[in-house]
């Protein structure tokens, strides 16, 4: 919105981290080029598995990283599903601009 307020739309390329609803909508409509998204569901699954292994007395790694998802205009609809493990919401499909370049 700061870019819009400054009248700089189309003159500034934006990228971001994390895929909240507002960011997803802006990527879908072409106002943000893309970014990276944490995988909260997958992070929780990894943490639960490690906790279970630790409770069973198994050795667990001291550090575990769940890879981020790269999100672009081309994959934002699928990325939303990957990140949140839900169907792509209608509001996001409606915001998607097919002919964005």
Question: Model-flagged regions — what are they?
Answer:
Residues 13-15, 33, 71:
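Structural detector of well-ordered beta-strand residues that form the stable sheet scaffold
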Residues 46-101:
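Hinge/cleft segment of the Venus flytrap/periplasmic-binding protein
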């Amino acid at each position: 919105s700061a870019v819009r307020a400054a009248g700089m739309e189309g003159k500034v390329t934006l990228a971001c981290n994390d895929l909240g609803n507002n960011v997803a909508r802006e990527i879908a409509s072409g106002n943000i080029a893309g970014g990276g998204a944490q995988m909260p569901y997958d992070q929780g699954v990894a943490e639960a598995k490690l906790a279970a292994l630790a409770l069973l007395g198994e050795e667990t790694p001291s550090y575990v990283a769940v890879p981020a998802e790269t999100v672009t205009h081309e994959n934002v609809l699928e990325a939303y599903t990957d990140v949140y493990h839900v169907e792509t919401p209608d509001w996001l499909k409606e915001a998607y601009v097919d002919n964005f370049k």
